[in-house]
């Protein structure tokens, strides 16, 4: 991003650049920690206006400190890069050992709404392979430029227009006789004609609700007895992120919630995120319910259909064949069908049903992912929604 130095003699807020830099560092810190923050159980199913607190490490100024009063100094071999640290004595900090007397690391909290968190996460993502259908009801938020203005934020700086305004000012300020600049600054010499604030132009942006194509997302979740609290929490985290993404990016997308044990039923948003059940598992029941809803309300001719299923893979063995058949039928009518297997822990040999899916589902629009811990939720969802992913291969993402 270009930075223009204002060389005018008009009084200026000198702390503005410091505030801008501080804000960038804070936002960068938030983005780095969002993956684990968004999966916290305390915010699952909450309102988008609910505020959450995010811990951020203090941003310290560079300073000189006293050494250890030992002979010699730290030295490098000439191949160091910015940010490298010289080896030295172990520092005081967390862990075993004697107490230290150095200053601790400053940590403070900032408040941010769930909606702002979601915007950070999914700003550059969209539903994959969305195609034009006969009916158009889906609205997508977009922005278009409507001319220029004198004030604005740095990302909206119109560089070419700003240069044109500077040239116009320069031409207008020349003396008609010898062309000497009236406004040149002695510090730079008369050959230099710097930018001033009056030269800068910014794009005027207007939010526009772009009319797009029909889309429905079917969220299928296993709520059987084998899905303990940890597994259900991970599954709900996945669907919570998916649901918030859809609310952010699309105005009229339909979302259908399906919960299943040995039988399946359509539920509302609150029941889906907060209600638990028990019993056995027939994965095919969830798929058959989804196919039933599609046939009754969402014709593939008119709708872009996306189906996602989360389960621990502990399916009744006699149901595996039927589950594979139903999954293949879903692939035939869906733009994308994603299966997420919830297996907490690091030791995972893969379930029977997942192996059945990978071996017997040949559709290119099928993808399988693993979610082992809460930090896996966001990367797993992004892999499913990544439009740039290879569409020519059936993927088993991990």
UniProtKB/Swiss-Prot annotation:
Q: Which domain of life is it from?
A: Bacteria
Q: Supply the PANTHER family for this chain.
A: UPF0229 PROTEIN YEAH
> Sorted alphabetically, which NCBIfam families does this protein's record hold?
spore_yhbH
Record InterPro entries:
Spore_YhbH, UPF0229, vWFA_dom_sf
Its source organism is: Ruminiclostridium cellulolyticum (strain ATCC 35319 / DSM 5812 / JCM 6584 / H10)
Q: Which segments show compositional bias classed as Basic and acidic residues?
A: 11-22, 78-95
Q: What is this protein called?
A: UPF0229 protein Ccel_0490
**Source taxonomy:** Bacteria, Bacillati, Bacillota, Clostridia, Eubacteriales
The UniProt family comment states:
Belongs to the UPF0229 family.
Q: Where is this region: Disordered?
A: 1-22, 68-104
């Amino acid at each position: 991003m270009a930075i223009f130095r204002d060389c005018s003699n008009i009084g200026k807020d000198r702390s503005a650049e410091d505030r801008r830099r501080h804000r960038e560092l804070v936002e960068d810190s938030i983005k780095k920690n969002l993956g684990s923050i968004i999966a916290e159980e305390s915010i699952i199913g909450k309102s988008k206006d609910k505020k959450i607190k995010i811990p951020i490490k203090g941003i310290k100024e560079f300073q000189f400190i006293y050494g250890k009063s030992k002979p010699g100094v730290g030295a490098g071999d000439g191949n160091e890069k910015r940010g490298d640290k010289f080896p030295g004595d172990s520092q005081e900090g967390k862990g075993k050992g004697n107490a230290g007397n150095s200053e601790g690391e400053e940590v403070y909290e900032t408040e941010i709404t769930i909606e702002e968190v979601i915007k950070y996460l999914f700003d550059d993502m969209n539903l994959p392979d969305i195609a034009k259908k006969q009916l158009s009801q889906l609205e997508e938020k977009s922005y278009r430029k409507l001319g220029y203005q004198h004030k604005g934020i740095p990302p909206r700086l119109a560089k070419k227009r700003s240069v044109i305004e500077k040239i116009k000012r320069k031409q207008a300020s020349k003396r008609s006789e010898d062309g000497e600049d009236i406004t040149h600054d002695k510090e730079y010499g008369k050959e230099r004609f710097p930018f001033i604030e009056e030269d800068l132009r910014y794009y005027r942006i207007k939010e526009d609700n772009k009319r797009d194509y029909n889309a429905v997302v079917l969220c299928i979740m296993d709520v059987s007895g084998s899905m303990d609290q940890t597994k259900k929490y991970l599954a709900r985290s996945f669907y919570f992120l998916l649901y918030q993404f859809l609310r952010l990016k699309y105005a009229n997308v339909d979302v259908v919630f399906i919960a299943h044990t040995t039988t399946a039923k359509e539920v509302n948003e609150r029941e889906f995120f907060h209600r638990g059940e028990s019993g056995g598992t027939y994965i095919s029941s969830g798929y058959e319910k989804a196919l039933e809803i599609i046939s009754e309300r969402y014709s593939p001719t008119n709708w872009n259909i996306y189906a996602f299923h989360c389960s621990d893979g502990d399916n009744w063995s006699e149901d595996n064949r039927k589950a594979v058949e139903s999954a293949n039928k879903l692939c035939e009518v869906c733009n994308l069908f994603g299966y997420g297997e919830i297996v907490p822990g690091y030791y995972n040999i893969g379930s029977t049903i997942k192996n059945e899916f990978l071996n017997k589902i040949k559709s290119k629009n099928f993808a399988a992912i693993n979610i082992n811990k809460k930090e896996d939720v966001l990367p797993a969802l992004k892999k499913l929604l990544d439009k740039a992913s290879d569409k020519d291969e059936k993927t088993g993402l991990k």
